[in-house]
Swiss-Prot record:
A Pfam entry, by short name: ATP-synt_ab
Function: Produces ATP from ADP in the presence of a proton gradient across the membrane. The V-type beta chain is a regulatory subunit.
Lineage, highest ranks first: Bacteria, Pseudomonadati, Coprothermobacterota, Coprothermobacteria, Coprothermobacterales
Species of the source: Coprothermobacter proteolyticus (strain ATCC 35245 / DSM 5265 / OCM 4 / BT)
SUPFAM superfamilies, per database record: P-loop containing nucleoside triphosphate hydrolases
Protein name: V-type ATP synthase beta chain
InterPro entries linked: ATP-synt_VA_C (IPR055190), ATPase_a/bsu_AS (IPR020003), ATPase_F1/V1/A1_a/bsu_N (IPR004100), ATPase_F1/V1/A1_a/bsu_nucl-bd (IPR000194), P-loop_NTPase (IPR027417), V-ATPase_su_B/beta (IPR022879)
Gene3D superfamilies (alphabetical): 3.40.50.12240
Keyword annotations of the record: ATP synthesis, Hydrogen ion transport, Ion transport, Transport
CDD domains: ATP-synt_V_A-type_beta_C, ATP-synt_V_A-type_beta_N, V_A-ATPase_B
Domain of life: Bacteria
The keyword Transport is assigned to this record: yes
HAMAP family named among the record's database cross-references: ATP_synth_B_arch
Keyword Acyltransferase: no
Gene designation: atpB
Entry's family note: Belongs to the ATPase alpha/beta chains family.
């Protein structure tokens, strides 16, 4: 039911206090009318005396005496259909590509419906990103939420665009889509993402939601929810496997902190609201698979760690909720290695659910484990060499140092347009393992060595 009020008592920054509203709902949409101009807002807090509303377009020019507030009795919704594929929207679901609104099949609440834990199906099946450091050693699984922890100046935007353009499921019979949400990005970054999707042709199977740095703060809070509402529709009503990429969650959390400060809430760690964990969970937990549904939602949230601090509240809380992490390394970046993924610091907790016979290849797990062990030993020997000099190393230590160097330059490093299949990734792994004596391949069964190593040698 629509209710109209002319009882605005205070305008404070982006916030408006409307008195005499006792029945407003949290998240309810509000229209403000001033001299024929209409602005939109959302209820952030409600009491028996007043409602606190944040205005999307800002409050400049709003005056308490001449502004009318209309409470619309509904929350934010997004009109969905398969026509949203190939489109670019702003952070509030309005077309940004100059085209008209797509045909609407239905309107869905951007907050979605909570998944019953009993109805969830365990994440499984392999998603190929075309990036060896992920596919080979930190495999992404359908229904998983696997964040990328980056830092200022690292190429996470390029990596996100590459994953979005290359990712696919191996079965050609299953439909795949990408939902991409960017929060607080610059105009230059927005152009980069749009051009990257168009150049690779990935735009045809993708939906983009772009919130710019100069857009209202409250829009930044809504952007990932619009994206996930679109993802849920495509996954659970159109039977698609959807990869949702959310960047940059640090900008999202900064918006949370800004709104919390404007509401004069008691701050938590480093000024972030105490409910940030719950708020992040309401986004990350929308990934998954549902029993009886063919589709799935896989999430890759991307965040920049302030001052590269992994104990910062944003990466810390994200790590608790998600199922692993991909770390980008400044050291590898300084070596001009792209993508600079630190495979030893990275982890995919659900990797074993999506690899092996019937998913990728029978030797995948063994090759991955051996690469991890050999690379770790090579890095240890490299550090020892720095402290004590090369003379302190044994011949085997020197071999492992060479192995570590080649793994970084041949396995981790790849071109920005290089899309490797899982077979190519494993072949590179076997080629590197060939450097080591057979007696050192202790994590691989003899039958796999006999089957795959000769192929590499030939």
């Amino acid at each position: 039911m629509i209710r109209e009020f002319r009882s605005i008592s205070e305008v404070n920054g982006p916030l408006v206090f409307v008195e005499g509203v006792s029945d407003a709902a949290y998240g309810e949409l509000v229209e403000f009318q001033l001299n024929g101009e209409i602005r939109h807002g959302q209820v952030l807090e409600t009491t028996d005396r007043f409602s606190l509303v944040q205005v999307f377009e800002g409050t400049q020019g709003l005056t308490p005496k001449t502004t009318t507030a209309r409470f619309l009795g509904r929350g934010l919704t997004f009109g969905v259909s398969e026509g949203i594929l190939g489109r670019v929207f702003d952070g509030l679901g309005e077309p940004l590509d100059g085209k008209p609104q797509p045909f609407v099949d239905k309107y869905v609440d951007i907050n979605g419906a909570p998944m019953n834990p009993v109805s969830r199906e365990y994440p499984a099946e392999f998603i190929q990103t075309g990036i060896s450091a992920i596919d080979g050693m930190n495999t992404l699984v359908r229904g998983q939420k696997l964040p990328i922890f980056s830092g200022s100046g690292l190429p996470h935007a390029r990596l996100a665009a590459q994953i979005a353009s290359q990712a696919k499921v191996l079965s050609s019979e299953e439909k795949f889509a990408v939902v991409f949400a960017a929060m607080g990005i610059t105009f230059e970054e927005a152009n980069f993402f749009i051009q990257s999707f168009q150049k690779t042709g990935a735009i045809e199977r993708s939906v983009l939601f772009l919130n710019l740095a100069d857009d209202p703060t409250i829009e930044r809070i809504a952007t990932p929810r619009f994206a996930l509402a679109a993802a849920e529709y495509l996954a659970f009503e159109k039977d698609m496997h959807v990869l949702a990429i959310l960047t940059d969650m640090t900008n999202y959390c900064e918006a949370l902190r800004e709104i919390s400060a404007a509401r004069r809430e008691v701050p938590g760690r480093r000024g972030y609201p105490g409910y940030m964990y719950t708020d992040l969970a309401s986004i990350y937990e929308r990934a998954g698979r549902i029993k009886g549904k063919k589709g799935s939602i896989t999430q890759i949230p991307i965040l920049t760690m302030p001052e590269d601090d992994r104990t910062h509240p944003i990466p810390d809380l994200t790590g608790y909720i998600t199922e692993g992490q991909i770390f980008l390394s400044r050291d590898l970046q300084h070596k001009n290695i792209y993508p600079p993924i630190d495979v030893l610091q990275s982890l995919s907790r659900l990797m074993q659910r999506g690899i092996g016979e019937g998913h990728t290849r029978e030797d995948h797990s063994a090759v991955s484990n051996q690469l991890y062990a050999a690379y770790a030993r090579g890095k240890e020997a490299r550090e020892l060499e720095i402290v004590l000099g090369e003379a302190a190393l044994t011949d085997l230590d020197r071999l492992y140092v060479k192995f570590a160097d080649r793994l970084e330059s041949e396995f981790i490093a790849q071109g920005e347009d290089e899309n490797r299949t899982i077979e190519e990734t494993l072949a590179i792994g076997w080629r590197l393992l060939r450097m080591l004596p057979r007696s050192e391949l202790k994590r691989i069964r003899d039958e796999y060595i006999n089957k795959y190593l000769p192929k590499v040698e030939s």
